[in-house]
């Protein structure tokens, strides 16, 4: 954190909850479950003088909330190894302490000054999902799902340009948003018989996950947001900062993971090649609807990990080799408008290679 009047904070969350659930077979192959969770939470956050931590807090706020959270699922086992699952639930999401504490600190990942907003509220979710599941064997499956979420007061990041030309980031609750999309997962272990010892002696793995997500902010006339940029809370009109129909901050349309690997139990070796893709997303809102948002482009990344167990004089060792970011993908964050691009936090991540050795005692 940065030194200053409030370079330290103390925060706490105390939750008490009770739940009841009924699970029953409605008819052969059809099972239902319904439950209700009651939760009460006391949240407190205060900022302190680092040189006088026992003195009265510079700022203090406490909030108590009660929730009733219902949930229901319906599962149809229409085949021995296949089923359809439907779910409906209400859940909550709480801001992180660092998003709440009105204290400046430097984010080491973005090299940007961040300060929390103590007036953030919990996000409430209504979740609807449907999923088809096919299990080939233990730990091996194919699933296909669709989901919808309605969010009230989602937390978003806001980037404010300071007089020094650098961005300072804080947080706020957007009025509401809708998210919907689909997901496919596949995981398969198999052994090959090619007559080649190097191939035949290994158990091979293919794992794939792809998620498509789209979202939109819901902003109406009269909606406001609460900001704490200067130490004094303000409630500007939401339309000054947000446009209805925009994507949620932090949401990528496409997320994909491909994992290829093998295991050799006799040799004690394991290798994994991991390919990930994340499409562009809004990393932070700009301080006006007339200014472009900050956008990240994570792109494609490839990692490789190899491990092997061996013994030396009766002692067990594990050697490892790791290669990260083989594609050399750079970090990109920028604003774009009028066919021009201004990089706000773009840099070369580089590639990393490491060797490791561990002993078991």
Which stretches of residues belong to each language-model region?
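Signature of Gram-negative outer-membrane beta-barrel scaffolds
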Residues: 1-81, 105
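Outer-membrane beta-barrel signature, preferentially recognizing the C-terminal barrel domain
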Residues: 9-14, 63, 92-143, 148-151, ...
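Residue-level signature of outer-membrane beta-barrel architecture
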Residues: 20-26, 66, 74-78, 90, ...
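Outer-membrane beta-barrel channels and translocator barrels
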Residues: 27-29, 77-81, 125, 137, ...
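Transmembrane beta-strands of outer-membrane beta-barrel proteins
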Residues: 32-36, 70, 84-86, 141-144, ...
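Outer-membrane beta-barrel translocator domains and adjoining extracellular loop/strand segments
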Residues: 44-52, 97-103, 110-112, 154-161, ...
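Gram-negative outer-membrane beta-barrel transporters
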Residues: 146-151, 168-285, 358
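C-terminal beta-signal and adjacent terminal beta-strands/loops
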Residues: 276-286, 308-361
């Amino acid at each position: 954190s940065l030194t200053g009047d409030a370079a330290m904070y103390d925060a706490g969350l105390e939750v008490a909850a009770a739940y009841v659930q009924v699970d029953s077979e409605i008819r052969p192959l059809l099972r239902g479950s319904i439950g209700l969770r009651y939760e009460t939470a006391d949240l407190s956050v205060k900022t302190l003088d680092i040189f006088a931590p026992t003195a009265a807090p510079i700022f203090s706020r406490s909030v108590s909330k009660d929730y009733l959270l219902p949930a229901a699922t319906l599962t149809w086992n229409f085949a021995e190894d296949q089923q359809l699952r439907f779910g409906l639930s209400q859940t909550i999401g709480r801001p992180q302490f660092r998003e709440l504490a009105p204290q400046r600190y430097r984010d080491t990942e973005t090299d940007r000054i961040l300060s929390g907003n103590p007036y953030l509220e919990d996000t409430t979710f209504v979740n609807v999902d449907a999923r088809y599941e096919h299990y080939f064997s233990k730990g091996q499956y194919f699933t296909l799902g669709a989901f919808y979420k309605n969010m009230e007061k989602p937390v978003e990041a806001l980037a404010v340009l300071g007089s020094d030309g650098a961005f300072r980031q804080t947080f706020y609750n957007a009025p509401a948003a809708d998210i919907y999309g689909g997901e496919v997962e596949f995981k398969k272990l198999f052994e090959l018989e090619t007559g080649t010892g190097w191939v035949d002696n290994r158990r091979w793995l293919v794992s794939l996950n792809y998620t498509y997500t789209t979202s939109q902010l819901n902003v109406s006339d009269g909606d406001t947001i609460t900001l704490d940029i200067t130490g004094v809370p303000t409630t500007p009109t939401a339309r000054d900062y947000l446009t209805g129909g925009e994507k949620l901050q932090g949401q990528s349309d496409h997320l994909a993971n491909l994992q290829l690997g093998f295991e050799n139990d006799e040799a004690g070796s394991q290798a994994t090649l991991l390919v990930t893709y994340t499409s562009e997303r809004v990393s932070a809102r700009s301080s006006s609807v007339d200014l472009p948002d900050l956008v990240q482009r994570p792109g494609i990344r490839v990692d490789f990990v190899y491990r092997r167990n061996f013994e030396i004089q009766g002692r067990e060792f594990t050697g490892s080799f790791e290669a990260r970011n083989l594609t050399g993908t750079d970090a990109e964050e920028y604003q774009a408008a009028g066919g021009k691009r201004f990089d706000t936090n773009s840099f070369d991540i580089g590639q990393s290679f490491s060797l490791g050795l561990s002993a078991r005692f």
